[in-house]
């Protein structure tokens, strides 16, 4: 919970990736709060109050996963809503002439997105495809598996692009982005 709160303020992409990992952690522990407490939460150096807050947070996520039928897979609706907001912002940035750097980064990463979609779920949105790729590589690294140079290059470009989108998301939420010229 505490990590999620900080990530949500600084990088929405990192926040989503973290939340997807938390969903997987909950599943790995059988959606059982006592098992999560014993094998996961108790490993952290929390004060008693923090531990209680963390357990409440996990308990709420477990409840949502049960209610939404996400025990076996899929993302929680709270994460889907944020992803939709990010996807919507992506569309607005591409439509606007005020963000040429974003457009350039998008077209730089587009061949990688096309290749990933051809290999995987063709129905996924481009942004979700990018996040899935980042999550997949993160999991490979955690498992200390080898990542090919081609994949490393693609992930580097995707990371830059998604980082830029995350920065625009935070800026839009804090200051508001202007998508049109003032004289229109």
Regions found by a protein language model. Name each.
Residues 2-73:
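N-terminal interaction modules that seed assembly of large macromolecular complexes
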Residues 8-11, 50, 54, 75-78, ...:
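Residue-level recognition of alpha-helical structural elements
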Residues 21, 28, 56, 60, ...:
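Charged, amphipathic alpha-helical oligomerization/scaffolding segments
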Residues 29, 47, 65-68, 72, ...:
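Short secondary-structure junctions and interdomain/linker hinges
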Residues 67-95, 173-184:
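Charged low-complexity stretches with an acidic bias
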Residues 76-137:
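A charged, amphipathic interaction segment
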Residues 114-184:
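Glycine-rich, aromatic-bearing surface loops/beta-hairpins
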């Amino acid at each position: 919970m505490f990590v999620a709160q900080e990530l949500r303020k600084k990088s929405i992409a990192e926040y989503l990736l973290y939340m997807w990992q938390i969903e997987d952690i909950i599943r790995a522990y059988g959606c059982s709060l006592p098992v999560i407490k014993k094998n996961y939460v108790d490993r952290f150096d929390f004060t008693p109050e923090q531990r209680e807050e963390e357990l409440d947070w996990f308990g709420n996520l477990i409840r949502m996963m049960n209610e939404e039928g996400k025990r076996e897979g899929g993302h929680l609706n709270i994460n889907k809503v944020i992803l939709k907001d990010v996807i919507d912002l992506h569309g607005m940035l591409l439509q606007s002439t005020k963000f040429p750097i974003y457009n350039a980064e998008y077209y730089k990463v587009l061949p990688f997105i096309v290749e990933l979609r051809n290999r995987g779920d063709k129905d996924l949105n481009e942004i979700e495809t990018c996040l899935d790729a980042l999550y997949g590589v993160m999991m490979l690294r955690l498992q200390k598996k080898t990542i090919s140079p081609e994949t490393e290059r693609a992930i580097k470009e995707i990371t830059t692009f998604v980082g830029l989108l995350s920065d625009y998301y935070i800026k839009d939420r804090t200051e508001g982005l202007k998508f049109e010229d003032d004289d229109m």
